[in-house]
Amino acid sequence: MQMYPVEQAALVELEAGLARREAAQPAAEAPRKAGGVALHVRQVVKRYDGREVLHNVALDVAPGEFLAIVGRSGCGKSTLLRLVAGLEAADGGSITVDGESAAKGRARHADVRVMFQDARLLPWKRVLDNVALGLPRTRRGEAADVLAQVGLADRAREWPARLSGGQRQRVALARALVHHPQLLLLDEPLGALDALTRIEMQGLIESLWRRLGFTALLVTHDVSEAVALADRIVLIEDGRIAMDERVALARPRERGAAGFAQLEAAVLKRVMRQAPQAQVPSHAGAHADPAATTAPLNVSWAA
């Protein structure tokens, strides 16, 4: 994967920031207790260049719940995830994570982790060192334990460039989970993987979520993925919540089952019901949902 200078500079800054944080941590720091947190979104508004991308969005997610957000490209779903993560500030309304504001710069970094479509591994660090970023030295052994949980114990000393796309995403997942997040934000994390690898990763994410109990918020274009993983599926259309559907299917879910296929078809039909928006001229810029294509460079992604 080609890395542009600005991306490489961001990775260097990330590594330096994590090193500073590690040095400031008490040597005997213990991992946080596992479990999920409540998320409350209240009448949130977000504008780009005067255009509203999110319109009075209101949403509640219970502790330990798995919520999937679907919708067409540019509908605002990635923007909402960035606001929840504290990567950007809303122009109106409020977002709280476990009762604390998620406003830009105030999100509780220790309890929230984000996993993107690009694993964003540091290419000059081996796999185990990527997972251990930000951990105090007394907890480095946990990185190896989590690598084993995602099935990569034998790749600990490999360089990221030698891994497949699915393996890199497993490392990114391990890097997030080693910090015991109480809220895991997933922004199309499996979008670049082949179909079989996607299904394997979905099973891995579900099994770890069920065991660890964190709250999960998944943004995806894949309705089948949403049905497979989520307790609820929310559809965003033109910056508004157009559907909030509970998934009343027993786990683990079978894609060939009649109930699974029926719900997938119903949600997909609802997503497709909206007519596509007129294409934005190239000279006008893409302001519909910049978060869908712009990689954040000032955050600790899944680290």
From Swiss-Prot:
Q: How does it sit in the membrane?
A: Peripheral membrane protein
The catalytic activity of this protein is classed by the Enzyme Commission as: 7.6.2.14
Q: Where in the cell is it found?
A: Cell inner membrane
Q: Name one GO molecular function term.
A: ATP hydrolysis activity
Output the Pfam families linked to this UniProt entry.
ABC_tran
What reactions does this protein catalyze? ATP + H2O + aliphatic sulfonate-[sulfonate-binding protein]Side 1 = ADP + phosphate + aliphatic sulfonateSide 2 + [sulfonate-binding protein]Side 1
User: Which SUPFAM superfamilies does the UniProt record give?
Assistant: P-loop containing nucleoside triphosphate hydrolases
Its chief place of residence is membrane
Give the residues the record marks as binding ATP.
G71, R72, S73, G74, C75, G76, K77, S78
What keyword terms does UniProt attach to this protein? ATP-binding, Cell inner membrane, Cell membrane, Membrane, Nucleotide-binding, Translocase, Transport
**Domain ABC transporter per the UniProt entry, residue ranges:** 39-263
Q: Briefly state the protein's biological role.
A: Part of the ABC transporter complex SsuABC involved in aliphatic sulfonates import. Responsible for energy coupling to the transport system.
Q: How does it assemble?
A: The complex is composed of two ATP-binding proteins (SsuB), two transmembrane proteins (SsuC) and a solute-binding protein (SsuA).
Query: What's the protein name?
Result: Aliphatic sulfonates import ATP-binding protein SsuB
